[in-house]
Amino acid sequence: MIKIWIDDVRPAPKGYIWIRSVNEAKRFFNSSIGKNRIVALVDLDHDAGDFASFGGDYIRLLDWFEETGRNYPIRLHSLNPVGIQNMRRVIIKNGWKEVK
């Protein structure tokens, strides 16, 4: 089982795979590693900062999960309260599990 940390600035905690952009995340989830391992948790920031030009802010990854029928446990660690509200709406709409 793997844990994914998606954030442009804050380093991943020990035991997580650190991904910095939406495009990098898509490549990972489409790779043999992403397809063949159980994802225990996707821990997401909202604001992609300098990495936004590589696929947008991280809410775009939730949109992509929805489009591709993916369902992973998700934790939100953003400091952006509006961003968290917007991401939480996508999580609730899809019936995904939010880990707090």
Placement of each model-derived feature along the sequence:
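Catalytic phosphate/metal-binding cores of nucleic-acid and nucleotide-processing enzymes, i.e., regions
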Residues: 1-100
